[in-house]
Amino acid sequence: MDIFTLSESSNLLIYINRTTPGSSNLKFQDLGPWYYRNQYDSTQPIQYNPLSFSKFDMPEISDIDGDGDLDILSYDQGNYTYRLFKDVRIEKGWNRDTFEFQIMDICFGYFNEGFDNSIALGECPYKDKLKPRHTGGASCFMYDSDADGDKELVISNIGFPRFTYLKNGKAQSKSYYDTMVAVDTIFPQNT
């Protein structure tokens, strides 16, 4: 198992597990701080930016797109959206202990999460300038709850006692993009 953590400056650090099978001595290789390739804005030259997160939030680190490598979904506090950072090592034919993250979606699921824990489906405020209202405390995880091949999203925020479940309609609409089509603000129902 590898370790994903944050530096003091909130940049992503990755430690690859180099423990010999059967050994009781844990050994990790520090891969240093990570950057993502910012190619989303075609008007700007390609540049690499630090992959950083709020110390109060917990990103989802899993194979979100189903291609066999680890991707990262994180809350964007400035815009109240979730950002998808895709690892493209599989596409480049690289081995398992290398990563190249590219920002693939600046408004994952095409929804907005308000400072009051409200969800606005079909709204992506990325191009709008919003005043910061949220100081952190967000977490998220994804799973394919309906076994249709796309992953639904569950989010939570500090100060709110329940989770919010967002249904992904990508598979039903045969869309290229993940699009949240329904929201359940009392999730799970049995609590």
Task: List each language-model region with its residue ranges.
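Beta-propeller blade termini
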Residues: 1, 55-64, 136-145
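A charged, solvent-exposed segment within the mature domains of Sec-exported extracytoplasmic proteins
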Residues: 5-7, 16, 30-36, 55-60, ...
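Short loop/turn segments that connect beta-strands within the blades of beta-propeller domains
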Residues: 7-10, 77-78, 136, 158-161
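Calcium-coordinating acidic loop motifs
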Residues: 18-20, 62-69, 88-90, 144-150, ...
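Long, internal scaffold/assembly segments composed of regular secondary structure
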Residues: 126-134, 143, 151-154, 158, ...
